[in-house]
């Protein structure tokens, strides 16, 4: 009697999904690591899942990393926001980027993170890389006071001109009266 090779059990949908996830995860990891190698600047890349990754970068390398992300298919900014860390007197600025044109990346979001100090809250604008950064950078400037150098139009979106030097999303901002706005005579 000859021995026949043992047949592999059929894969169940969960196993197939796990294999597909590993393939896509490795694809995202591979793309980001290739980008990191080509850049030759210090960045910290963390792939959190098959569709989420975070890149931490010094503000001096922000523009180079953004251009590299653009070159591998991340073609727009979804959101721009900031986090205020008063204990270290820093702001962390976050850009969430994705793709409309690359089907593989369309469901992927990469968060590009960088820090600026209270003493020098300036960053290069990423509007030249992604026009979709336009409104998010304006809002972050208005609400946190972070300047985006090279942005073509850093003017107010929501607040009245009387709010000059007042940044309501900073943790140091306190509302002094009930409600934010005071009725004024017409």
What are these regions (language model features)?
Residues 1-186:
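Terminal low-complexity/charged segments
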